Structures are given as structure tokens and as C-alpha cells.
């Protein structure tokens, strides 16, 4: 059906038919369909007819616009394609929305979000995708009802708004006229001017009332006047009106003063809160002046004693493997270690060592300045069972020789058994050539002023001073995994054993990781306990089991009289490992580089005053006993 036929139908019975079918809405709803594709237009027409709509079709947007302008009231809905050759569908949408205010549904095969959004923002009430379905077309009548309801509501609102505006204008005119009359009369009575001048003044007053009031800037001088007025009246009795009178400043209203007074009161309240908080803090810390609260906490700081320089600070990094072996906190945690007495002759010394820190041991100075508690436990007069007297040992590759019988106390070299994996690894390792020489350099780390006595080619002996039970002399011994020596299971670092320090451990030992833990036994009733150390290695199958006897002398075979301990410290003629008496339970903590010790020991040493009154000199690198 052509456009002309459609126009005749609309102008003829189509209108009457539409008018007759208005009672059965949406049956007979008038729809204008616009599409440049004849096939799509034909399908759309058939679907609309199946919905019992009156349909008018056209293939050009310009023709549809002309038809709408000529018959504005003859259509209820417009369905238009987006892409048309003569005119874009969005342009047609804008024109229909501006001129006819009809609901327009956009139809397109492009379902992109941007295209749909563009159609909705231009005023389309719906956006349908081709091919159109019958179910979608059966519900398009909702847009017609929605548009009519919105139009009716807008018309009603416009009418109401117009009536209200008209009434307000009338009232405003009457009020304005009355006000102008009163002002004109007052001005004539006061000034005696003409009516024209009064009218001009009234107009000026009306203009000034509509102007925005200038903002008040509180300068320093203005604030000083405000504060002076508040202080004169009192903060409790200060009100904006009285403050304004006392200030006597122009261009300031009571509202400005009231706002500033409120801010000023909040400021004073905040100051009082801060002051009370500082006072409470000062009272809590015992200070008198709140300004010195932070310094008050140091009032009794001198009770801890004065600082002193630890003389061995420079030796603790490389040479001092054990620096605090005589401190209670350098040993086992309280209550976690064994506390029963130790019997002599049934335990072995388990040493498993790693070589991370052995690179810093120069010429056997492994325990320089370190005091070690190598203490024995047992009844007085006990001897070492299972050890016979005979000749001293020679090398690590030889078998166990008889121990020689004499009153001398010697400490020969600590030898590893041939089956020991540590000996095998050290002897065969190409990276540590000096570690394999077990027959050369196992010496005692003693001060330089002590004479080195060689019972064999490279042996050192030291005089041992102690107060305690006498112990049978032992000449020399060798190490194996099962030799029962002392009645305490010593687990310690290589440096913790008296006179068991390798001199040639100055090679590069960075591949190893040195970690140690130290523990000890309780000391009861003037009995002495061995200091036990355990040195673990990060290398697999790397262990060293060396029983050791930390009791030696440097006398040439003369035992003499055992001298007592002197004030718990090392003398010039004393070996680094003296017997020390402690009656505290031991605790272990970690020091730097995996050593044993505690922070409390360091703090006690730092705050302990120097004891130089007794005149006893220290060996270089020695720490005080706690």
C-alpha cells in the first residue's frame, strides 16, 4: 500500500475506524512504520496488523516527517529504522520529539551498547533489534499510555504553577504597593521631599535588600577588640549584643559576633582539655612541670649505674666465639634442663661443629677474653674411672696409648678417631687443607704472657686455679665416640673446651653455617658442673665427638698447692677457663652469630660500674663476672 493510499485511509475511514476503536485500546492504535528496506518493512507491517494495530508504512524518513506534520493528531506511535539513506533515524527522532511529542521506537540490526545508548539519550522510548518478534510488538502500547499520562501530569503541574505564580504576583504587587506607599509617606514626613524622590529612595531600598551582604573578615585588630570585650564582660556573661556594643565597629552585625563567639568558646574548651590531659600525664609520671613530662621518666635513670666501655668490644666479632660462658643467662632456660647431680665417668662429650665462624680464629685465639665455667660435679676425691695411667698420646691416627702416672695434670691434644666422619671430611677436603692436619695444631688458647710448655711437639698447658674437690690428675686422653670421661655430657662449642682450639682454622669457611646453643647443669652445695655446649653444623654427617678434660697445668710436672680463685676473675697466671662457682639456674638465649648469651647479661655489663679498686688486672678481651 502506497503512502497516498495510506494518507487517504488515515484521512477517511481510518480516522473514524481509529475513533471507533478507541474504546478497545490498544486495538486500533495508530502506528507509523518507517524503513528503507522493503522486506523488513513488509514483515513489520504484517506483525503490527496481527496485533490489530492500524499501520501506515513509508520507505523514506522525509516522507514520514511530512506525513506527521500534516496529520499531527492522527498517529499514536512511530517505529523508525536507525540507518536510512535520506535521513538518519536519530535526526528524525529529534524532530518528532520537538514538534509532535510522540513516542518513537528505534529499530536496527546493530545492537551495540553505544548505539542503543545514543538512541535512548536522543529521546527514544524503546530500542528493538531486527528481526522483530511478535511478543515485542504486542507490548508497545505501554509507551503510548505512559506518554499520555506524563503529558497530563505536566499540563496539570503547569496550570497549578501558573495559578500560584499569578497569585503570588498579585499579592506581591499589592504588598509592594503598600510598602512603597508607607515608605513614601515616611520619607515625605521626615524630609519633606517630593513624591518622586521618595519613590526613587524606595526603589533604591528595594535594590539594596536584594544585594548579598558582604562577608566579614576577622583581622588581627578586630579579633583583639573582640577578645578585649569578652574579657571585660567575662566568658560566661558575654553575649553578642553586649560584645558588639563594646567593640563599636561598623559593618559588623550581631550574627557575625555570635558566630565568632561560638568558635572562640570551642577554642577555649579545646585548650582546657589539652591542659588537663597534660596535667594528668604529669601527675602520672610524677613530674611537676608538664613541659618536662618527657624528661621526667629519666629521673631515676642513674639508679642503673653509669655506663662503662666494655674493653672486649673489639674482640667479640671474630675471635671471641664464647664471651659470656660464666653468666647465668648464657645457659639453659630455667626449668627446662636437667638439674640432678652429675656423676663422674659415664658421659661423653658430643661436639658437632660447623665452620662458619672458624674462619675468624687466628692462631688458636678462639676464646680470647672469654671466661668459661668448666666446673665438675661429684664428691671430693673421686677419680676418673675407666682411664688408666700411662704414656701420653701422640697423634690422632694412632690408637689409644696408656696414660702416664704422675702428679702432673696435662691436657694433650684432642684427637678424632679414624672412624669419625668429621676427621675424614676435614682430612680430605680440598677447600680446607689446614683442617686435615690433626697432628699439628691443637693448642690451648691462653694469654701471651703464659709460658707455652710442650709435652709433645705442639702442646700447651695452663695452670688451673680452683676452689673445690680435688680431682685425680689426668695426663692425656684421646677422643672417640664411646670413651667415658667426665660425669657430665658436655655439648659445647670448640672454644668452650679448655685447650681444644685448632690454630689452623683461619681458612675461608664461608660455606659453613655456625650455630650454637649452650646449656649447663645446676650447681648445688659447692659442687661444680661442667659447662655443656653443643655446636651443630649445617653440613650433613659433619660431627665431632670429643670428650675433653678441662683441667690442666703449666707446671713442669710439679703439681704444687692449688691456689684459690681470686675474686672470680682470671689472673695473669690463670688459664682462660677457670673454675667458676655459680648458684643460679642457667638460661640460654641467642647472641649474635648464633652464640649463647642474653641481652640481660649485656645490659648488666653495660650498667655495672668499673671495679678497679682491687687492683687486679684483666686479661685483654675479658668480661666481668656477673
Swiss-Prot record:
Keywords: Activator, Cytokinin signaling pathway, DNA-binding, Nucleus, Phosphoprotein, Transcription, Transcription regulation, Two-component regulatory system. The modification 4-aspartylphosphate is found at residue 81. Two-component system major event consists of a His-to-Asp phosphorelay between a sensor histidine kinase (HK) and a response regulator (RR). In plants, the His-to-Asp phosphorelay involves an additional intermediate named Histidine-containing phosphotransfer protein (HPt). This multistep phosphorelay consists of a His-Asp-His-Asp sequential transfer of a phosphate group between first a His and an Asp of the HK protein, followed by the transfer to a conserved His of the HPt protein and finally the transfer to an Asp in the receiver domain of the RR protein. InterPro entries: ARR-like, CheY-like_superfamily, Homeodomain-like_sf, Myb_dom, Myb_dom_plants, Response_reg_B-typ_pln, SANT/Myb, Sig_transdc_resp-reg_receiver. NCBIfam families: myb_SHAQKYF. Transcriptional activator that binds specific DNA sequence. Functions as a response regulator involved in His-to-Asp phosphorelay signal transduction system. Phosphorylation of the Asp residue in the receiver domain activates the ability of the protein to promote the transcription of target genes. May directly activate some type-A response regulators in response to cytokinins. This is Two-component response regulator ORR24.
Amino acid at each position: 500500500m502506497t503512502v497516498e493510499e495510506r494518507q487517504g485511509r488515515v484521512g477517511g475511514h481510518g480516522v473514524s475506524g481509529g475513533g471507533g476503536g478507541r474504546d478497545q485500546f490498544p486495538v486500533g492504535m495508530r502506528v507509523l512504520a518507517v524503513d528503507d528496506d522493503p522486506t523488513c518493512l513488509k514483515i513489520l507491517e504484517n506483525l503490527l496488523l496481527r496485533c490489530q494495530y492500524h499501520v501506515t508504512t513509508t520507505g523514506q524518513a522525509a516522507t514520514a516527517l511530512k506525513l506527521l506534520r500534516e496529520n499531527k493528531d492522527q498517529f499514536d506511535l512511530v517505529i523508525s529504522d536507525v540507518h536510512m539513506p535520506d535521513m538518519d533515524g536519530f535526526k528524525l527522532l529529534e524532530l518528532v520529539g520537538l514538534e509532535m511529542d510522540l513516542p518513537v521506537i528505534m529499530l536496527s540490526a546493530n545492537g551495540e551498547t553505544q548505539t542503543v545508548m545514543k538512541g535512548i539519550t536522543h529521546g527514544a522510548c524503546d530500542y528493538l533489534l531486527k528481526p522483530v518478534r511478535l511478543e515485542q510488538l504486542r507490548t508497545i502500547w505501554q509507551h503510548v499510555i505512559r506518554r499520555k499520562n506524563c503529558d497530563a501530569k505536566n499540563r496539570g503541574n503547569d496550570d497549578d504553577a501558573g495559578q500560584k505564580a499569578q497569585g503570588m504576583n498579585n499579592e506581591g504587587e499589592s504588598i509592594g504597593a503598600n510598602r512603597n506607599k508607607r515608605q513614601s509617606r515616611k520619607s515625605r514626613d521626615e524630609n519633606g521631599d517630593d513624591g518622586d524622590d521618595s519613590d526613587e529612595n524606595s526603589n533604591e531600598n528595594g535594590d539594596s535588600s536584594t544585594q548579598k551582604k558582604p562577608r566579614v573578615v576577622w583581622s588581627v585588630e578586630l579579633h583583639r577588640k573582640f577578645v578585649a570585650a569578652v574579657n571585660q564582660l567575662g566568658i560566661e556573661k558575654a553575649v553578642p549584643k553586649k560584645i558588639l556594643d563594646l567593640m563599636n565597629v561598623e559593618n559588623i552585625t550581631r550574627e557575625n559576633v555570635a558566630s565568632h563567639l561560638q568558635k572562640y568558646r570551642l577554642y577555649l574548651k579545646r585548650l582546657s582539655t589539652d591542659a588537663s590531659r597534660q596535667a594528668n600525664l604529669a601527675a602520672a609520671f610524677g613530674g611537676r612541670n608538664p613541659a618536662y613530662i618527657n624528661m621526667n621518666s629519666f629521673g631515676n635513670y642513674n639508679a642503673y649505674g653509669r655506663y662503662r666501655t666494655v674493653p672486649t668490644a673489639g674482640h667479640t666479632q671474630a675471635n671471641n666465639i664464647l664471651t659470656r660462658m660464666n653468666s647465668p643467662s648464657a645457659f639453659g632456660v630455667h626449668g627446662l634442663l636437667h638439674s640432678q647431680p652429675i656423676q663422674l665417668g659415664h658421659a661423653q662429650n658430643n661436639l658437632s661443629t660447623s665452620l662458619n665462624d672458624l674462619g675468624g680464629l687466628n692462631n688458636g685465639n678462639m676464646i680470647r677474653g672469654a671466661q668459661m665455667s668448666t666446673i665438675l660435679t661429684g664428691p671430693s676425691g673421686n677419680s676418673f674411672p675407666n682411664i688408666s695411667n700411662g704414656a701420653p698420646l701422640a697423634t690422632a691416627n694412632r690408637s689409644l696409648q696408656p696414660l702416664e702416672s704422675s702428679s702432673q695434670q696435662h691436657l694433650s691434644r684432642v684427637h678424632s678417631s679414624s672412624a669419625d666422619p668429621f676427621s675424614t671430611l676435614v682430612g680430605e677436603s680440598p677447600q680446607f687443607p689446614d683442617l686435615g692436619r690433626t697432628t699439628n695444631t691443637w693448642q690451648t688458647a691462653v694469654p701471651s704472657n703464659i709460658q707455652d710448655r710442650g709435652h709433645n711437639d705442639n702442646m700447651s698447658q695452663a695452670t688451673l686455679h680452683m676452689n673445690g674437690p680435688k680431682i685425680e690428675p689426668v695426663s692425656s686422653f684421646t677422643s672417640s665416640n664411646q670413651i667415658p670421661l667426665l660425669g657430665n655430657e658436655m655439648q659445647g662449642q670448640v672454644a668452650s673446651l679448655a685447650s681444644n682450639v685448632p690454630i689452623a682454622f683461619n681458612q675461608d669457611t664461608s660455606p659453613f653455617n655456625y650455630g650454637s646453643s649452650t646449656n649447663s647443669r645446676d650447681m648445688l652445695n659447692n659442687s661444680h658442673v661442667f659447662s655443656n655446649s653443643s655446636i651443630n653444623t649445617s653440613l650433613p654427617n659433619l660431627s665431632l665427638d670429643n670428650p675433653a678434660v678441662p683441667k690442666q697445668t703449666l707446671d713442669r710436672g710439679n703439681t704444687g698447692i692449688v691456689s684459690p680463685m681470686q675474686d672470680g676473675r682470671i689472673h695473669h697466671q690463670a688459664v682462660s677457663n677457670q673454675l667458676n662457682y655459680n648458684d643460679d639456674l642457667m638460661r640460654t638465649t641467642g647472641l649474635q652469630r648464633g652464640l649463647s648469651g642474653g641481652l640481660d647479661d649485656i645490659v648488666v655489663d653495660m650498667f655495672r660500674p668499673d671495679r678497679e679498686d682491687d687492683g687486679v688486672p684483666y686479661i685483654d678481651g675479658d668480661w666481668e663476672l656477673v
